[in-house]
């Protein structure tokens, strides 16, 4: 187990009250958070979203990506379902970090797509480690999920890590003129499924 569960508290939101559970990576001390809505115990698979940190989209309302739109839609869907989990995966910019993400944005402004920009900076298209999320699910006592994602790689990695993904639930929101090239690149070069 790469993580330990270290803290929890109630978190009221516009969609209802979630339980916020804090985790810490044993090796690095990096923190991650789960937002739990309702009773997630039992045999019924849990609706869940693994949401990677995106300061620009989640908190600064950037239109360059669909992250903030996905975060809001996922919390809303989980609350409507009456139970579910959002894992807030603290790997900013597909795990290249905030400053490198800003550098990647500058390269995108020069005409590179999101994958090419990462490569120009010496990174893979996606540096994230989703096995940490499997540990979070296990520490929450969940092993069967209906995963809110457009990314088949998340499904593969979580499945390989022992989480039974019984259904992939599309989360297609937030397309706009500022991010359509970004989304098209994610579909063409990273295999994201962006049509219903």
Swiss-Prot record:
Zn(2+) binds at residues 54, 65, 67. Belongs to the GTP cyclohydrolase II family. Signal peptide: none annotated. GO terms for cellular component: cytosol. It catalyses: GTP + 4 H2O = 2,5-diamino-6-hydroxy-4-(5-phosphoribosylamino)-pyrimidine + formate + 2 phosphate + 3 H(+). Keywords: GTP-binding, Hydrolase, Metal-binding, Nucleotide-binding, Riboflavin biosynthesis, Zinc. Pathway: Cofactor biosynthesis; riboflavin biosynthesis; 5-amino-6-(D-ribitylamino)uracil from GTP: step 1/4. This is GTP cyclohydrolase-2. GTP binds at residues 49-53, 70, 92-94, 114, 149, 154. SUPFAM superfamilies: RibA-like. One of its GO terms (molecular function) is zinc ion binding. Its EC number is 3.5.4.25. It holds the Pfam family GTP_cyclohydro2. The gene is ribA. Catalyzes the conversion of GTP to 2,5-diamino-6-ribosylamino-4(3H)-pyrimidinone 5'-phosphate (DARP), formate and pyrophosphate. Binds 1 zinc ion per subunit. NCBIfam families: PRK00393.1 (NF001591), ribA (TIGR00505). The keyword Zinc applies. One of its GO terms (biological process) is riboflavin biosynthetic process.
């Amino acid at each position: 187990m790469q993580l330990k569960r270290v803290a929890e508290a109630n978190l009221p939101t516009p969609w209802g009250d979630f339980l916020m559970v804090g985790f810490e990576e044993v090796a690095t001390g990096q923190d991650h958070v789960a937002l739990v809505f309702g009773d997630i115990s039992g045999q019924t698979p849990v609706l869940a979203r693994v949401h990677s940190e995106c300061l620009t989209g989640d908190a600064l309302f950037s239109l360059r990506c669909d992250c903030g739109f996905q975060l809001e839609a996922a919390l809303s869907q989980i609350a409507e379902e009456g139970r579910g989990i959002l894992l807030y995966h603290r790997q900013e910019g597909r795990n290249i970090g905030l400053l490198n993400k800003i550098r990647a944005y500058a390269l995108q402004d020069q005409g590179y797509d999101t994958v090419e920009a990462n490569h120009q900076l010496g990174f893979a298209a996606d540096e994230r480690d989703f096995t940490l999320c499997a540990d979070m699910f296990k520490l929450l006592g969940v092993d069967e999920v209906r995963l809110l994602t457009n990314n088949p790689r998340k499904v593969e990695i979580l499945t390989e890590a022992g989480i039974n993904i019984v259904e992939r639930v599309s989360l297609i929101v937030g397309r706009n003129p500022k991010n359509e090239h970004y989304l098209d690149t994610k579909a063409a070069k990273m295999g994201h499924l962006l049509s219903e």
